[in-house]
């Protein structure tokens, strides 16, 4: 039996550069991963079987057509797998939950059976975030997010607080709103430097269109800003927001304050990998 965490992905910066002819967008982003997320448990079986449990298991559109099931059918191997997916991350939340699940599944199959030589191509076909989620290490992503570059990670161990309104926000409408409301304007490349420098100087170009679609996101950011974090921002296309702290005690104090004043909001704590 193998247990893997599907680490929550956050974008410490996300610059949208242009829309491509194929409909996808050229982006530059700083991927980071939290040491918490969904949990997958796998064991050998005669045939593939996927069981979903956890707080958000019932909101999966089709638990048998999610990225875990698709990963299992994509990677060749001998024998089946019985996989239990504990869905702790909200869906359509900007945390790469499905991609993180797929990344964990790649790591499980690598340990049990090994991966094919073309595994990266298979990962890309499953989703733009999947290659980054397989490694689950801080990296710069370019293109659609699949072209990964190393970055000096001087943020490992920082305390993280994730907060979500419990409102799903699909990626497609946010990118469309970016083109409509921002006119698709390129506001410039990702800064250079260490992870801290990029995160501090960077931006999330999808935050304005996401807030236009879901205005309460601004309330989450305001609540997080009031806890005096090192930085706070929306992750990906939203609606999850994150705050980073140099001290665990500050994060825990912030989490208690958020829970007290906004008991209906979802939250998760962890540290950056």
Swiss-Prot record:
Record InterPro entries: GHMP_kinase_C_dom, GHMP_kinase_C_sf, GHMP_kinase_N_dom, IspE, Ribosomal_Su5_D2-typ_SF, Ribsml_uS5_D2-typ_fold_subgr
Gene3D superfamilies linked: 3.30.230.10, GHMP kinase, C-terminal domain
GO BP annotations, alphabetical order: isopentenyl diphosphate biosynthetic process, methylerythritol 4-phosphate pathway; terpenoid biosynthetic process
Assigned keywords, A-Z: ATP-binding, Isoprene biosynthesis, Kinase, Nucleotide-binding, Transferase
Active site feature: 9, 129
Catalytic activity entry: 4-CDP-2-C-methyl-D-erythritol + ATP = 4-CDP-2-C-methyl-D-erythritol 2-phosphate + ADP + H(+)
E.C. numbers: 2.7.1.148
Tree of life domain: Bacteria
GO MF terms, alphabetically ordered: 4-(cytidine 5'-diphospho)-2-C-methyl-D-erythritol kinase activity; ATP binding
Pfam families, per the entry: GHMP_kinases_C, GHMP_kinases_N
Pathway membership: Isoprenoid biosynthesis; isopentenyl diphosphate biosynthesis via DXP pathway; isopentenyl diphosphate from 1-deoxy-D-xylulose 5-phosphate: step 3/6
Amino-acid positions noted as binding ATP in the UniProt annotation, renumbered to this chain: 90-100
PANTHER family named among the record's database cross-references: 4-DIPHOSPHOCYTIDYL-2-C-METHYL-D-ERYTHRITOL KINASE, CHLOROPLASTIC
Biological role: Catalyzes the phosphorylation of the position 2 hydroxy group of 4-diphosphocytidyl-2C-methyl-D-erythritol.
HAMAP family in the cross-refs: IspE
Family label: Belongs to the GHMP kinase family. IspE subfamily.
Record-given protein name: 4-diphosphocytidyl-2-C-methyl-D-erythritol kinase
Gene: ispE
């Amino acid at each position: 039996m193998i247990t893997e965490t599907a680490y929550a992905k956050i974008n410490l910066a996300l610059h949208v550069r242009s829309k491509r002819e194929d409909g996808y967008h050229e982006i530059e982003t700083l991927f980071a991963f939290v040491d918490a997320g969904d949990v997958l448990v796998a064991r050998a079986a005669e045939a593939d079987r996927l069981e979903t449990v956890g707080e958000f298991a019932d909101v999966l559109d089709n638990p048998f057509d999610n990225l875990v099931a698709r990963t299992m059918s994509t990677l060749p191997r001998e024998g089946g797998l019985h996989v239990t997916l504990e869905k702790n991350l909200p869906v359509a939340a900007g945390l790469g939950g499905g991609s993180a699940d797929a990344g964990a599944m790649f790591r499980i199959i690598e340990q049990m059976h090994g991966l094919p030589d073309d595994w990266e191509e298979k990962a890309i076909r499953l989703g733009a975030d999947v290659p980054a989620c397989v490694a689950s290490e801080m990296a710069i992503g370019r293109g659609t997010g699949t072209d990964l570059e190393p970055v000096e990670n001087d943020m490992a161990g920082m305390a993280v607080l994730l907060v979500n309104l419990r409102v799903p926000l699909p990626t497609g409408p946010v990118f469309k709103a970016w083109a409509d409301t921002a006119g698709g304007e390129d506001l410039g490349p990702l800064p250079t430097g260490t992870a801290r420098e990029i995160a501090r100087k960077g931006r999330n170009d999808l935050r304005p269109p996401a807030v236009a679609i879901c205005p309460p996101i601004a309330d989450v950011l305001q609540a997080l800003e009031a806890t005096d974090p090192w930085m706070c921002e929306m992750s990906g296309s939203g609606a999850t927001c994150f705050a980073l702290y140099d001290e665990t005690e500050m994060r825990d104090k912030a989490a208690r304050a958020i829970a007290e004043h906004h008991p209906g909001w979802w939250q998760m704590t962890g540290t950056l990998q």
